[in-house]
Regions:
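C-terminal segment of classical bacterial N-terminal signal peptides
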Residues: 37-46
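A cross-kingdom C-terminal cell-surface attachment/processing module
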Residues: 567-590
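Signature for phosphate-centric chemistry
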Residues: 48-174, 180-420, 424-548
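Extracellular Ser/Thr-rich, low-complexity/disordered mucin-like segments
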Residues: 549-573
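Classical Sec-dependent N-terminal signal peptides that target proteins to the secretory pathway
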Residues: 32-36
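Bacterial N-terminal signal peptides that target proteins for export
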Residues: 7-31, 568
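Ala/Thr-enriched low-complexity intrinsically disordered regions
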Residues: 2, 9-10, 17, 547-548, ...
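N-terminal prepro-regions of secreted/extracellular proteins
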Residues: 46, 560, 565-566, 590-593
C-alpha cells in the first residue's frame, strides 16, 4: 500500500509485535500464520470481579494477547482481504480539564484552616498529591494523550498492519484516516499511523461523523444549519437536556442512584480515612462548605487556571466555575475521578510531580466498585442503551454505521480505499456499541419516571453494562472485509463480500439475529449484516453455497428486556484489568490549541 513503511523511532521499548522486528518480506507470512493458526472461536477470559480495580471508562486499554490473535478465524476458502475499517476511542489521557484537582484543592484549604484533616501530616500529603497531579497535567497538557495513550494506539496500528499485511502489500490501495478534530483524537490517529508505518498520512477532520453528539465542533465551529448533522445533534442535545432536567426520567433515575444509602455510606467511609467525621458531616451544609471551581472556591467568583499553565496554549487548564462539590458524595466522587485517571498517567507520575491516590482506596475495593457504578450510570443513560422503548441515545450513531457500509460498498464498486481508520471518543463508541448490540450493550433500564426501587433503575446486579468493558481507553470496533472472485453459483452473481468484527481487538460474533455464513463462524455476508442491522431486504441465503430461498423476515437484533441476567455467556471480554508497566520513555508530543 502506498506510504506504508517502518514506524519511526519513538524512544519506547519495542513491542514484541513491532513492525521494526519484522522484515518487510515476512509480513505476508506473518499474516498467513495468524490466519492458519486456528479455526476455533475467540472467547476472552472473564476476569474475576474481586481482582478488578474498577476504573470505569478510564480503564487503560488491554492489548490482545497472542492467544486472542491466534483465535482469529481465517476467512472461508477462496476469500481474500478486500478492506478493513476501524473506529477507535482516543487512548489514555490525563485530566480533561482543571476541575477535580482544583475542587479538592479548595476543599483541602478549608479542611486545613478548620482542622478538618485527621492529622496535619495527612493533610500535607493530600495537598502534595493534588499539587503533583496538577503539575503533571500542566506539563503534559490537560486532555492530551499520556505516554500510555500513545503506546496503545501505536501498538494497535502495528497489529493492524500485521493482520492486514496482504491488503497493504498492494501499492494501488489507499488509506484514509479521520479524526473528530479534538486534539486527543488526532494524537491517537497520529500514533496509530506511526505504528501502522504511514506516519506522514494526514488525518481528515470529520466532526460531522465522529463528533455527532454536539452542535459545536471541537474547533469551535458549528455544524451547518439545515444539514442532517446539525439536526441530529440538536435533537440529541435537546433530548438529553429534557431528560436530565427537572422532571426528566434520566434525572430521576440518576438522582435515585446517587441518593441510595450505599452511595452515602461508601462516600463517608472513603473520606473517613482522610477527614474528621465533623468535617465530612459539614460538607454541603452551608456556603462555607460548598466549593466551586473558582479562584477562591466561592460561587460566582472568577475561573481559576492551573499554576504554571499557559491558558493561550492550553485553555483546558482553566476551570469551569459552575463545577462544584456540594456533598460528601460529590467529594468522594471527585477523589475517585483522580484515582482512576492516575491509572492512565503512569509515565507522567514521576519526579518532580509524583502522586499517589491509590493509597486512599486501599481496603476500599468494594467502595471503588460502587463509585464505578455511579459513574457508569451517567454514561449508560446518556450515551448507551438507556431507557427501554427509547433509542435517542444511540440512534445518533446511525450515520457512523451507514459510513461503515458505505466504505464497503465503495470498495466493492472498484474504489481504491482499502483501509479507513477513524479516531474519536467515548461519546462515539458507547452509542455505536449500543446500536450494534455489542456484548454488554444489550439491556436497557426500565422507563420509570418516578423510580421507587432498585428494580426501576440501572443496576449492576441486573444489567451487564460496564464502562470498563464497553469503552476503555482506546476502545475500538474493527471490521475486516474479504471477497472472492468469480460468480457465485448459488446466486448467479458476483460473490457477496464477508465481514468479521473485532471488539477491542478480540474477535466476536455479530449481534443475535445476524446469521453467519456457517455454524460457529464469525464471518457474515455484508447483505446479511445490512438486513439484520438496518432492516434492508436480502435476496440470498446468509450461508455460503446455499441455494435455498432466503427468509428475510428473521428479526434483527433487539435490546433485551430490562432487568434479566448479566449477559455473561455472550460477554466474552471480561472485566479489563489494569496490566500496564511500560517504562518511562521519551516521546513526541504534539500540542494543538
Amino acid at each position: 500500500m502506498a506510504g506504508i513503511g517502518h514506524p519511526q523511532a519513538t524512544g519506547r521499548s519495542p513491542d514484541p509485535t513491532s513492525l521494526d522486528r519484522v522484515k518487510p518480506g515476512s509480513l505476508l507470512t506473518y499474516a498467513a500464520v495468524l490466519a492458519a493458526a486456528s479455526t476455533f472461536l475467540a472467547v476472552p477470559a472473564q476476569a474475576d470481579d474481586t481482582d478488578a480495580d474498577f476504573y470505569s471508562s478510564k480503564q487503560p486499554y488491554i492489548a490482545p494477547t497472542d492467544a486472542d490473535i491466534a483465535a482469529y478465524q481465517p476467512a472461508p476458502a477462496g476469500y481474500s482481504p478486500l478492506a478493513t475499517e476501524t473506529v477507535a476511542r482516543h487512548g489514555s489521557r490525563g485530566l480533561s480539564g482543571y476541575k477535580y484537582d482544583l475542587l479538592l484543592h479548595r476543599l483541602a484549604e478549608t479542611a486545613q484552616a478548620e482542622g478538618g484533616f485527621l492529622t496535619p501530616e495527612i493533610g500535607t500529603e493530600f495537598i502534595a498529591n493534588l499539587d503533583a497531579i496538577t503539575a503533571a497535567n500542566v506539563e503534559n497538557g490537560y486532555g492530551m494523550l499520556t505516554g500510555q495513550g500513545e503506546t496503545q494506539h501505536q501498538g494497535m496500528g502495528e497489529r493492524a498492519a500485521a493482520r492486514n499485511a496482504a491488503l497493504f502489500a498492494d501499492a494501488g490501495n489507499r488509506i484514509v484516516a479521520e479524526t473528530s478534530g479534538e486534539s486527543r483524537a488526532t494524537e491517537s490517529g497520529e500514533n496509530f499511523l506511526l505504528g501502522l508505518g504511514d506516519a506522514d498520512l494526514a488525518l481528515e477532520p470529520r466532526p460531522d461523523l465522529l463528533y455527532f453528539h454536539k452542535v459545536e465542533n471541537p474547533d469551535g465551529t458549528e455544524k451547518a444549519p439545515g444539514t442532517p448533522e446539525r439536526e441530529r445533534a440538536e435533537a440529541y442535545e435537546a433530548y438529553i437536556e429534557a431528560q436530565t432536567d427537572d422532571g426528566g426520567t434520566i434525572a430521576a433515575a440518576t438522582e435515585f442512584i446517587e441518593e441510595r444509602p450505599e452511595s452515602v455510606r461508601v462516600s463517608e467511609e472513603l473520606l473517613s480515612g482522610i477527614f474528621t467525621a465533623e468535617f465530612i458531616a459539614a460538607m454541603g451544609a452551608d456556603a462555607a462548605h460548598t466549593w466551586y471551581a473558582t479562584v477562591d472556591g466561592a460561587k460566582g467568583s472568577a475561573p481559576a487556571c492551573a499554576p504554571g499553565a499557559d491558558p493561550a496554549a492550553d485553555p483546558d487548564a482553566c476551570s469551569d466555575p459552575k463545577k462544584s462539590i456540594k456533598s460528601a458524595v460529590d467529594a468522594a466522587m471527585t477523589l475517585y475521578n483522580l484515582y482512576i485517571i492516575a491509572a492512565d498517567m503512569e509515565e507522567e507520575n514521576v519526579a518532580p510531580h509524583e502522586f499517589d491516590f491509590a493509597q486512599y482506596f486501599d481496603g476500599h475495593e468494594t467502595d471503588a466498585e460502587w463509585f464505578a457504578y455511579l459513574l457508569d450510570a451517567e454514561d449508560f443513560y446518556e450515551k448507551g442503551p438507556s431507557l427501554a422503548g427509547h433509542d435517542e441515545t444511540y440512534a445518533v450513531a446511525q450515520p457512523l454505521l451507514d459510513d461503515f457500509f458505505r466504505v464497503i460498498d465503495d470498495r466493492v464498486a472498484g474504489g481504491d480505499v482499502a483501509a479507513t481508520f477513524r479516531f474519536a471518543h467515548a461519546e462515539t463508541i458507547v452509542p455505536f456499541a449500543a446500536l450494534l448490540k455489542l456484548p454488554g450493550s444489550t439491556v436497557p433500564a426500565p422507563d420509570v419516571a418516578a423510580p421507587a426501587s432498585v428494580d426501576d433503575v440501572f443496576d449492576y446486579a441486573s444489567n451487564p453494562w460496564r464502562g470498563s468493558q464497553v469503552t476503555p481507553m482506546a476502545a475500538n470496533v474493527q471490521w475486516d472485509v474479504v471477497s472472492r472472485a468469480g460468480v457465485d453459483p448459488a446466486t448467479g452473481a458476483a460473490y457477496t463480500p464477508l465481514v468479521r468484527m473485532l471488539y477491542n481487538e478480540r474477535e466476536i460474533a455479530f449481534a443475535d439475529g445476524c446469521r453467519p455464513v456457517a455454524e460457529g463462524s464469525h464471518w457474515v455476508k455484508v447483505t446479511e449484516l445490512k438486513r439484520c442491522l438496518t432492516g434492508a431486504a436480502m435476496a440470498e441465503s446468509p450461508l455460503i453455497g446455499d441455494t435455498a430461498p432466503v427468509d428475510d423476515t428473521v428479526p434483527g437484533p433487539e435490546l433485551a428486556a430490562t432487568g434479566g441476567g448479566t449477559d455473561a455467556a455472550t460477554w466474552g471480554l471480561g472485566i479489563l484489568l489494569l496490566a500496564v508497566g511500560a517504562a518511562a520513555v521519551s516521546r513526541r508530543r504534539v500540542f494543538r490549541d
